[in-house]
């Protein structure tokens, strides 16, 4: 078992601050956007949905180019560019007088696609054996940002409106840039220049990375589909109102962080990582079946949430760590950009399928369907793990 070195820990915490600030600003909008945007002039459900979803389309389109750019010009300059674009989109949305202006601002926000470059920067500063731990620390910061946003979003929106939330998001993005250059050291110099696009595409479609990219597609599709129905399930079965659902998320996230910390200490090899990924996929199936139980028991909701977020957070740490280990160092940014593209693609499709499932099959039907999809992923993963292990040797 390898412990994090002092530089690895320092860099992990600093980068967590950068990522956490950006994600907190992003999460602030989500709990209240639909309710407030529907009151704007000429608002329709289609336009409200477009305003929410167009961010993900921008992310999908630009993750690979931004990751490739980080391989060529450096991680910190690329992340800075992405954060400036994100801040610009936030300002545009804050100044907008109608939903169309907000849609344009959200589209510009999505073009600041820095997830792949940020994960590549974390990988640059960590040893292979410790990379999952570094990703876990960053994942915890995202989880905390999510819970904090759930707590403060409604009060802030009530006092300052959507314009105030978008303005705060822009300020947080600029603060993240300050953190990036003040606290995060420059990554080690690479001796090999980034490859041409043809080589990058060949690397992205290699079987070992396809298995992992398909996995994150399934994982985030399941997450988004579940969040279409999760708030209603928590109200119905656990008796927790929409404004108070952080009371469930906070202890569940804390407990899942403890589970993650305990397990990741023992995951160092590629083979161990794949065993953990398979186990987490199985746990996701079980958690979705707990949600689908239909018994309207609060303890099943709590158990399902603990299983779901423990497995999800472990996967969030392990999958990108494995991508960074299997990709060539000089194409790491592009590889993690492709990974992030699949992540956002899965989230987009999951939202659509989740809404369809809820409308036509109800809460229990949606979660039964999600469990079936998770089981399909588990089967594919069981067959595909050999591709990862064979090419990792």
For the regions a language model picked out, list residue spans one by one.
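C-terminal membrane-cytosol helix-exit motif in multi-pass small-molecule transporters
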Residues: 171-189, 380-384
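Cytoplasmic helix-loop-helix junction between adjacent transmembrane helices
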Residues: 105-142
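Helix-to-loop junctions at the C-terminal end of transmembrane segments
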Residues: 62-74, 259-272, 358
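Juxtamembrane intracellular "pre-TM" segments in multi-pass secondary transporters
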Residues: 2-8, 184-215
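C-terminal transmembrane helical hairpin of 12-TM major facilitator-type secondary transporters
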Residues: 274-319
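Short amphipathic helix-loop junctions that connect adjacent transmembrane helices
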Residues: 31-45, 228-244
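Conserved MFS/SLC helix-loop-helix module at the cytosolic interface between two early adjacent transmembrane helices
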Residues: 61-97
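Cytoplasmic membrane-interface "Motif A"-like loop-to-helix N-cap segments
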Residues: 72-82, 269-281
């Amino acid at each position: 078992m390898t412990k994090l070195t002092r530089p690895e820990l320092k860099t992990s915490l600093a980068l967590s601050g950068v990522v956490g600030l950006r994600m907190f600003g992003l999460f602030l909008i989500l709990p209240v956007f639909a309710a407030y945007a529907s009151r704007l002039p000429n608002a329709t459900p289609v336009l409200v949905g477009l305003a929410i979803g167009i961010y993900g389309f921008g992310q999908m389109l630009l993750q690979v180019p931004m990751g490739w750019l980080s391989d060529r010009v450096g991680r910190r300059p690329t992340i800075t560019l992405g954060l400036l674009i994100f801040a610009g989109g936030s300002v545009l949305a804050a100044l907008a007088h109608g939903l169309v202006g907000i849609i344009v601002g959200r589209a510009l926000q999505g073009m600041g696609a820095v997830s792949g470059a940020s994960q590549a920067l974390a990988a640059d500063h960590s040893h292979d054996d410790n990379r999952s731990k570094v990703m876990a620390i960053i994942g915890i910061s995202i989880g905390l940002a999510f819970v904090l946003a759930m707590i403060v979003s409604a009060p802030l929106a009530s006092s300052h409106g959507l314009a105030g939330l978008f303005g705060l998001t822009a300020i947080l993005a600029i603060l993240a840039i300050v953190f990036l250059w003040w606290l995060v050291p420059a990554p080690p110099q690479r001796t090999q220049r980034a490859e041409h696009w043809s080589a990058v595409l060949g690397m992205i479609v290699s079987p070992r990375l396809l298995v992992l990219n398909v996995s994150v597609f399934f994982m985030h599709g399941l997450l988004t589909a579940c969040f279409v129905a999760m708030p209603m399930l928590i109200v119905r079965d656990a008796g927790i109102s929409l404004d108070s659902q952080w009371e469930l998320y906070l202890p569940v996230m804390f407990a899942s962080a403890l589970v993650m910390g305990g397990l990741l200490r023992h995951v160092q090899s590629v083979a161990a990582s794949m065993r953990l990924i398979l186990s987490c996929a199985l746990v996701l199936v079980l958690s979705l079946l707990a949600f689908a139980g239909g018994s309207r028991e609060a303890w099943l909701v709590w158990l399902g949430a603990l299983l779901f977020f423990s497995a999800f957070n472990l996967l969030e740490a392990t999958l990108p760590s494995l991508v960074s280990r299997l990709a060539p160092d000089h194409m790491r940014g592009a590889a993690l950009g492709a990974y992030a593209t699949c992540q956002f693609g899965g989230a987009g499709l999951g939202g659509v399928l989740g809404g369809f499932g809820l409308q036509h099959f109800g809460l229990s039907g949606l979660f039964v369907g999600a469990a079936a999809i998770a089981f399909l992923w588990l089967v594919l993963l069981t067959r595909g793990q050999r591709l990862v292990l064979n090419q990792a040797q």
